[in-house]
Amino acid sequence: MSLDVQSYMAERARAVDAALARHLPSESDPPETLHKAMRYSVFAGGKRLRPVFVIAGAEAVGGRMDTVMETACAVEMIHTYSLIHDDLPAMDNDDFRRGVPTNHKVFGEAIAILAGDALLTLAFRLLADNFAAGSDAHALRNILIEIADAAGSAGMVGGQVADIESEGKRVGAETVDYIHTHKTAALIRASIRAGAMLAGATPSQLVALGLAGGNLGLAFQIMDDILDVTATSEELGKTAGKDQAQQKATYPAVHGLEVSRIHAKALVSEAHAALQSFGPRAEPLRALGSFIVERKA
């Protein structure tokens, strides 16, 4: 029987939401405005795809969701901080995210910047909290390095810089690949590997999961590019057509829609092949890959 990926994602997203509610500061704790801004963006919706990837990565090597929940929450906080900052006028200048006004439209630019900063730093506190859960210290060191590299100048932030510097320019496939593998795929790859590390994955398993995660992350961003062209703002929960309006470097702009779709599906097929040795334990990762290329928003 094939996995019901929607139910799988919904069940784990609910668990992640409950954990996030526990770990985030209360809105009644000072500074109240900052904590309201942090919680506003974290709980503004979203698929919780990255924390679900953390959990699926652990499950692929026999781990359990409860042992990786702090790491799953940390990854979601890093992702949310990046969205808050991406939406600022100095960057993508977007008014809506996940169907609601962006953080800076509600709280102002200064508080939005600080809310992002606070989420990023809290994320690393949560990663360290895995010590209290009795996890292996060597694995935690490796996870800290993995996620810091994926989130920083060697990963997500570096990809964002390349994205900004490419606006309005004619760029080739190599530049688009660099942007997407760093800005998006790096954190998805790290999410899967981090979950597996906490669950005691072997070096060879981490190599295979890294290959699968990189391909799934790139496929996800290619589909984001496609949906920016084909979906409505209501379906996306954010302004559609922004990539073309801002002359961003995207897969459809360089390769066209059809070639982009074919490439995304090929990447998912390669990810499935990399997961073959994991057997049924990796079925959630396979199903998430299929979801990535079939989603409509």
Regions found by a protein language model. Give the residues of each.
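N-terminal amphipathic/basic leader segments beginning at the initiator methionine
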Residues: M1-P25
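Mg2+-dependent prenyl diphosphate-binding active-site environment of isoprenoid biosynthetic enzymes
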Residues: A15, L24, S28-A274, P280-V293
